[in-house]
Swiss-Prot record:
<dbReference type="GO" id="GO:0051898">
    <property type="term" value="P:negative regulation of phosphatidylinositol 3-kinase/protein kinase B signal transduction"/>
</dbReference>
<dbReference type="GO" id="GO:0030154">
    <property type="term" value="P:cell differentiation"/>
</dbReference>
<keyword id="KW-0732">Signal</keyword>
<keyword id="KW-0964">Secreted</keyword>
<dbReference type="GO" id="GO:0008285">
    <property type="term" value="P:negative regulation of cell population proliferation"/>
</dbReference>
<dbReference type="GO" id="GO:0030178">
    <property type="term" value="P:negative regulation of Wnt signaling pathway"/>
</dbReference>
<feature type="disulfide bond">
    <location>
        <begin position="61"/>
        <end position="107"/>
    </location>
</feature>
<dbReference type="InterPro" id="IPR018933">
    <property type="entry name" value="Netrin_module_non-TIMP"/>
</dbReference>
<comment type="similarity">
    <text>Belongs to the secreted frizzled-related protein (sFRP) family.</text>
</comment>
<feature type="domain" description="NTR">
    <location>
        <begin position="179"/>
        <end position="301"/>
    </location>
</feature>
<dbReference type="GO" id="GO:0005615">
    <property type="term" value="C:extracellular space"/>
</dbReference>
<dbReference type="Pfam" id="PF01392">
    <property type="entry name" value="Fz"/>
</dbReference>
<keyword id="KW-0879">Wnt signaling pathway</keyword>
<feature type="disulfide bond">
    <location>
        <begin position="98"/>
        <end position="133"/>
    </location>
</feature>
<dbReference type="GO" id="GO:0017147">
    <property type="term" value="F:Wnt-protein binding"/>
</dbReference>
<protein>
    <recommendedName>
        <fullName>Secreted frizzled-related protein 5</fullName>
    </recommendedName>
</protein>
<feature type="disulfide bond">
    <location>
        <begin position="182"/>
        <end position="253"/>
    </location>
</feature>
Length: 315
């Protein structure tokens, strides 16, 4: 009897979440109808929960697969304006395609599906997305944020949103991806957005590259450095410029196949270490690059940046 009731509850949830590509959510051991509408994390809200359309100017979740979202969301955002501001910071991560369920996971929190009870992501969904995306975030100097710690989410035998696409069989042998820091923008706007997300921008020569603990270390030549954006760099940083490419020992970076000539590098200073965020071969004939360097300080930096900011709780 209990198993049958549990199966019925699972079927009801699967129907309600049908817009999420028809993927099952497991509810065999959870009394869905017994859920209480308690304040999230002990916080009380000035307004009762409401459902509204996911707007087009919430691009993180507008194409997630369902039309209506619940407010307050599962990150304690009470207004749509707050959701938009915080969610926009995660668009760069979504664009990196570090896991096929990144959008489903993030939108289950930022724009939860409109039901009369909050439905959390399963812990396994969080862990799968974290395994795919945390190394990429670490490469840019951003730890997996506290608000997304997977122990906060229910186990898969509870009523929750399970992995949607992560179990699909591979249709082709895996291809080694280019290092994240070596993915290039080809427009001036793209370059300037990268500059917005970086603490410093330097034109430099690279003397040598070393492999150390799974990272690459780019050691700059003593001379012929030009600081285009100094940010937090101090004299000791620029005297012997050493840039760390996190988690990049085993991935290709075509720009660094030859160290001849100069490079345009962008990075962040994290815990005293200079992390490389982007690298380009310097090309004085490249009009887009010349334009970006000339006008980077007058460019209206997007709210998406610095890269992955908004991963912390709002202040």
């Amino acid at each position: 009897m209990r198993a049958a009731a549990g199966g019925a509850r699972a079927a009801v949830l699967a129907l309600l979440l049908g817009a999420l590509h028809g993927a099952p959510a497991r509810g065999e051991e959870y009394d869905y109808y017994g859920w209480q509408t308690e304040p999230l994390h002990g916080r009380s809200y000035s307004k009762p929960p409401q459902c509204l359309d996911i707007p087009a100017d919430l691009p993180l979740c507008h194409t997630v697969g369902y039309k209506r979202m619940r407010l307050p969301n599962l990150l304690e955002h009470e207004s749509l304006a707050e959701v938009k501001q915080q969610a926009s910071s995660w668009l760069p991560l979504l664009a990196k395609r570090c896991h096929s369920d990144t959008q489903v996971f993030l939108c289950s929190l930022f724009a939860p599906v409109c039901l009369d009870r909050p439905i959390y992501p399963c812990r396994s969904l969080c862990e799968a997305v974290r395994a795919g995306c945390a190394p990429l975030m670490e490469a840019y100097g951003f730890p997996w944020p506290e608000m997304l710690h997977c122990h906060k989410f229910p186990l898969d035998n509870d009523l929750c949103i399970a992995v949607q696409f992560g179990h699909l069989p591979a249709t082709a042998p895996p291809v080694t991806k280019i290092c994240a820091q070596c993915e290039m923008e080809h427009s001036a706007d793209g370059l300037m957005e990268q500059m917005c997300s970086s603490d410093f921008v330097v034109k430099m020569r690279i003397k040598e590259i070393k492999i150390e603990n799974g990272d690459r270390k780019l050691i700059g030549a003593q001379k012929k450095k030009k600081l285009l954006k100094s940010g937090p760099l101090k004299r000791k940083d620029t005297k012997r410029l050493v840039l760390h490419m996190k988690n990049s020992a085993g991935c290709p970076c075509p720009q660094l196949d030859s160290l001849a000539g100069s490079f345009l590098v962008m990075g962040r200073k994290v815990d005293g270490q200079l992390l490389l965020m982007a690298v380009y071969r310097w090309d004085k004939k490249n009009k887009e690059m010349k334009f970006a360097v000339k006008f980077m300080f007058s460019y209206p930096c997007s709210l998406y940046y610095p890269f992955f900011y908004g991963a912390a709780e709002p202040h």
